[in-house]
Amino acid sequence: MSSFPAPVLGTPLSPSATRVMLLGSGELGKEVIIALQRLGVEVIAVDRYADAPGHQVAHRAHVVSMTDPAALRAVIEQERPHIIVPEIEAIATDLLVELEQEGVARVTPTARAARLTMNREGIRRLAAETLGLPTSPYQFVDTQDALQQAIDGGIGYPCVIKPVMSSSGKGQSVIRGPGDLDAAWRYAQEGGRVGGGRAIVEGFIDFDYEITLLTVRARGVDGQIETHFCDPIGHKQVDGDYVESWQPHPMSPAALARAREIALGVTGNLGGLGIFGVELFVAGDQVWFSEVSPRPHDTGMVTMITQVQNEFELHARALLGLPVDTALRQPGASSVIYGGLDGRGVTFHGVAQALAEPGTDVRLFGKPEAFVKRRMGVGLAVADTLDAAREKARRVSAAVSVKAA
């Protein structure tokens, strides 16, 4: 029997409160906040812009540049959270390591996990070189000349280039031949979170499909840390950004076992408590590691309609030391609702039509400003088959239109 003490949760806005601070308060953070509040947790939401989705539901909100260590330390010392939950990559992660070492707060899953995964180089070297996991062939490059040398030296065409620090497909493109090189390098320099700089170039893998395997490290009733797996999530990406996802994606027993083995290896090394989005390429029974996020994953929004506990509830329970249940309820799918225009205070039309079909749901994120390719919501659907669920989810998202106020 573990000596780990059973979790005790306090009363929000009182001296006994269990305080959790989210660093990043977008649509994923918003759902984590709601899940935490349902367990009586006092939540502080931090983001770089005002009125972020998570700001709208938290007990308190702060606008802070999270890459500024001094500003971030000041707000953490002001609020004194028990647990810090990084919900985005663009954070002063060296500060999180310091705070964890100082005993100021516990970082979920760990400060090391946040630091390694904010940078594609850190997590790729851990996976491929330390853990020996199968990945695509890759090199890291600092200049366009180095990019050309990497391609000529074995990466070959076609290949993919990504900034080492970016998200949602920003700066990512496919290089199909020498004629694409100039534009791809410029785009990678523009798309990085810290401006121009280092990039990863990856050789193509001839895969059949890619999945997200949501992997949860949580304490059981005996206090021991256990690893749980959600059913695999298939997804479609356009320009590196998710547009639809579905669950469960069919896999051979051998491929599923290998996927879980890879996910167990990388999440076990990163450690801590919480959910991880492990991205994998699959061809037949072969599986390659792609990336991992130590937090809920955008493709996992489908779990809001498919699982007994969605990915946000799983993360909330796990980080609080509570048991989890990753069981699937019914096959389902998600489909993104884009802004389609640039503007503030937009309005959403067709929501009643979107929800008229049984087995559907809509989440509107409440972002204060729309952009043409910004995710403003998601359509959700369940059905007896994956094909039917995907078609239904597409109908839901297509029914919702975004208009200027």
From Swiss-Prot:
<comment type="similarity">
    <text>Belongs to the PurK/PurT family.</text>
</comment>
<comment type="pathway">
    <text>Purine metabolism; IMP biosynthesis via de novo pathway; N(2)-formyl-N(1)-(5-phospho-D-ribosyl)glycinamide from N(1)-(5-phospho-D-ribosyl)glycinamide (formate route): step 1/1.</text>
</comment>
<dbReference type="Pfam" id="PF22660">
    <property type="entry name" value="RS_preATP-grasp-like"/>
</dbReference>
<dbReference type="InterPro" id="IPR011054">
    <property type="entry name" value="Rudment_hybrid_motif"/>
</dbReference>
<feature type="binding site">
    <location>
        <position position="367"/>
    </location>
    <ligand>
        <name>N(1)-(5-phospho-beta-D-ribosyl)glycinamide</name>
    </ligand>
</feature>
<dbReference type="InterPro" id="IPR005862">
    <property type="entry name" value="PurT"/>
</dbReference>
<feature type="binding site">
    <location>
        <begin position="27"/>
        <end position="28"/>
    </location>
    <ligand>
        <name>N(1)-(5-phospho-beta-D-ribosyl)glycinamide</name>
    </ligand>
</feature>
<feature type="binding site">
    <location>
        <position position="210"/>
    </location>
    <ligand>
        <name>ATP</name>
    </ligand>
</feature>
<feature type="domain" description="ATP-grasp">
    <location>
        <begin position="125"/>
        <end position="320"/>
    </location>
</feature>
<dbReference type="InterPro" id="IPR013815">
    <property type="entry name" value="ATP_grasp_subdomain_1"/>
</dbReference>
<keyword id="KW-0436">Ligase</keyword>
<dbReference type="Pfam" id="PF21244">
    <property type="entry name" value="PurT_C"/>
</dbReference>
<comment type="function">
    <text>Involved in the de novo purine biosynthesis. Catalyzes the transfer of formate to 5-phospho-ribosyl-glycinamide (GAR), producing 5-phospho-ribosyl-N-formylglycinamide (FGAR). Formate is provided by PurU via hydrolysis of 10-formyl-tetrahydrofolate.</text>
</comment>
<feature type="binding site">
    <location>
        <position position="87"/>
    </location>
    <ligand>
        <name>N(1)-(5-phospho-beta-D-ribosyl)glycinamide</name>
    </ligand>
</feature>
<dbReference type="GO" id="GO:0043815">
    <property type="term" value="F:phosphoribosylglycinamide formyltransferase 2 activity"/>
</dbReference>
<keyword id="KW-0658">Purine biosynthesis</keyword>
<dbReference type="InterPro" id="IPR048740">
    <property type="entry name" value="PurT_C"/>
</dbReference>
<feature type="binding site">
    <location>
        <position position="298"/>
    </location>
    <ligand>
        <name>N(1)-(5-phospho-beta-D-ribosyl)glycinamide</name>
    </ligand>
</feature>
<keyword id="KW-0479">Metal-binding</keyword>
<feature type="binding site">
    <location>
        <position position="162"/>
    </location>
    <ligand>
        <name>ATP</name>
    </ligand>
</feature>
<dbReference type="GO" id="GO:0006189">
    <property type="term" value="P:'de novo' IMP biosynthetic process"/>
</dbReference>
<dbReference type="GO" id="GO:0000287">
    <property type="term" value="F:magnesium ion binding"/>
</dbReference>
<feature type="binding site">
    <location>
        <position position="120"/>
    </location>
    <ligand>
        <name>ATP</name>
    </ligand>
</feature>
<feature type="binding site">
    <location>
        <begin position="167"/>
        <end position="172"/>
    </location>
    <ligand>
        <name>ATP</name>
    </ligand>
</feature>
<dbReference type="InterPro" id="IPR016185">
    <property type="entry name" value="PreATP-grasp_dom_sf"/>
</dbReference>
<dbReference type="GO" id="GO:0004644">
    <property type="term" value="F:phosphoribosylglycinamide formyltransferase activity"/>
</dbReference>
<feature type="binding site">
    <location>
        <begin position="202"/>
        <end position="205"/>
    </location>
    <ligand>
        <name>ATP</name>
    </ligand>
</feature>
<protein>
    <recommendedName>
        <fullName>Formate-dependent phosphoribosylglycinamide formyltransferase</fullName>
        <ecNumber>6.3.1.21</ecNumber>
    </recommendedName>
</protein>
<comment type="subunit">
    <text>Homodimer.</text>
</comment>
<feature type="binding site">
    <location>
        <position position="279"/>
    </location>
    <ligand>
        <name>Mg(2+)</name>
    </ligand>
</feature>
<feature type="binding site">
    <location>
        <begin position="374"/>
        <end position="375"/>
    </location>
    <ligand>
        <name>N(1)-(5-phospho-beta-D-ribosyl)glycinamide</name>
    </ligand>
</feature>
<keyword id="KW-0460">Magnesium</keyword>
<keyword id="KW-0067">ATP-binding</keyword>
<dbReference type="InterPro" id="IPR011761">
    <property type="entry name" value="ATP-grasp"/>
</dbReference>
<feature type="binding site">
    <location>
        <position position="291"/>
    </location>
    <ligand>
        <name>Mg(2+)</name>
    </ligand>
</feature>
<dbReference type="GO" id="GO:0005524">
    <property type="term" value="F:ATP binding"/>
</dbReference>
<dbReference type="Pfam" id="PF02222">
    <property type="entry name" value="ATP-grasp"/>
</dbReference>
<dbReference type="InterPro" id="IPR003135">
    <property type="entry name" value="ATP-grasp_carboxylate-amine"/>
</dbReference>
<dbReference type="InterPro" id="IPR054350">
    <property type="entry name" value="PurT/PurK_preATP-grasp"/>
</dbReference>
<dbReference type="GO" id="GO:0005829">
    <property type="term" value="C:cytosol"/>
</dbReference>
<keyword id="KW-0547">Nucleotide-binding</keyword>
